[in-house]
Amino acid sequence: MIDACFSAFKGEEFQFEDQTATVLYPDGAPNGKIVFRTEYLGAFPNFEQEMLRRGYYVINVTHPNYYAEYEHIHQMARFVREMAAKLGASEKCILSGVSAGGLQAFRFALLYPELVSVAYLDAPVLNLLSLAGFGDAERDEALWRNLSRICNFTESSILIYRDSPIDHLDEFMKLDIPVVMVYGDSDTVVPYHENGKVLEDYYEAHGGKLAVFGKAGCDHHPHGLEDPTPIVEFVEQFV
């Protein structure tokens, strides 16, 4: 069921392979471009709402879990290609990745850069070691049990794990994907200095296209900006 926050827009929900997919249609004439919200479609949606008002499609497909397993990233790529063909839109989408959706967005862009024009990352999970509570994040035992079960981690194996997004910044930088990032400087769930700040520093050191908006005193929630215009203006430079 499509979230009530999108009630002002036409939308469809349907089956895509073994997952549930959603497409939201823009106000007025579509501009042939897609925003791909990778996770939590109905949460803090003001960026997507504004993009719908500006003529963009918004799409989403569910996942069995949050942790961006590679088989699911490949499924996301098949979904984007199918939706672009169905809608007559460009395959190069705007990624919108919030929290764990940032992990999905990063891996998607790394594997399928031909399907990405620009990425908006909001308090993104870019470091699984941090997410699991082996840093400054508050340890969530239920999350750790779930992560360790799905990804076959032990407390020893995750300490030597080197397949988080922050371990692939050199490869990612070479793809020349513009990034706009939003974060709270008091995030206790996905601490910025262990996640997004690593990407920010790397982009700045290597001349990447980047805009960053920090929110003083903000924890992991709420996501986004009260006025999404700065995010929208950044992404529209690259579509």
State what each model feature region is.
Residues 189, 193-239:
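C-terminal catalytic histidine-bearing segment of alpha/beta-hydrolase fold enzymes
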